[in-house]
């Protein structure tokens, strides 16, 4: 059974959560993915499918500022869930607050400024004769200057909407 965004609209999120809790004896798990429009999200969902029953993962909320890409990725994820015969609800949240509210785990995987900013960082560094990749050095420093303020905003939101959530940061620059 595949739970798509359309199906989710028929049952409000809180009602769905209550329904899951009653069926599973109060044990459900929600994961939120901030930056969920990235292509690796589909791989992440595929990995969760292999473990979702064992870990009682029932719900994954995807959020990204690129709504068009997010819609495509959510549909791909729903297809992966359907093909696997899984019962994992994967939906595109309307905003970051909806995504993280009630989450047990939050995964951050965002790229502030998109590929354009990454390319600029790398090209500037290379013109100066140094390695320009986004995880360390000049490129990593530029990336961190753009990324850290936004990550701190998300941390504040998570703290207020999901105070017990664990945060897994896969956002570069991971080396700084």
Q: Residue locations for each model-derived region?
A:
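Short acidic low-complexity segments
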Residues: 89-102
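NAD(P)-binding Rossmann-fold cofactor-contacting core
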Residues: 55-76
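Rossmann-fold NAD(P)-binding glycine/threonine-rich loop
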Residues: 116-176
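Short, Lys/Arg-enriched N-terminal segments with co-localized hydrophobic residues
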Residues: 8-28
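Short glycine-/small-residue-rich Rossmann-like dinucleotide-binding loops
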Residues: 104, 111, 172
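Gly/Ser/Thr-rich loops at beta-strand to alpha-helix junctions
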Residues: 37-41, 67-68, 169-176
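N-terminal Rossmann-like dinucleotide-binding module
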Residues: 31-56
């Amino acid at each position: 059974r595949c739970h798509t965004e359309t199906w989710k609209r028929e049952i409000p999120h809180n009602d769905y959560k209550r329904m899951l809790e009653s069926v599973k004896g109060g044990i459900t798990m929600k994961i939120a993915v901030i930056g969920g429009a990235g292509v690796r999200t589909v791989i992440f969902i595929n990995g969760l499918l292999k473990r979702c029953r064992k870990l009682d993962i029932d719900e994954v909320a995807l959020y990204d500022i690129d709504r068009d890409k997010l819609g495509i990725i959510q549909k791909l994820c729903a297809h992966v869930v359907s093909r696997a015969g899984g019962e994992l609800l994967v939906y595109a949240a309307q905003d970051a607050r909806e995504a993280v509210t009630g989450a047990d785990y939050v995964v951050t995987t965002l790229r502030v400024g998109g590929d354009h900013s990454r390319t600029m960082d790398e090209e500037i560094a290379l013109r100066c004769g140094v390695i320009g990749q986004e995880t360390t050095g000049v490129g990593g420093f530029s990336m961190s200057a753009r990324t850290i303020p936004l990550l701190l905003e998300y941390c504040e939101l998570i703290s207020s909407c999901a105070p017990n959530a664990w945060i897994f940061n896969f956002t570069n620059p991971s080396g700084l």
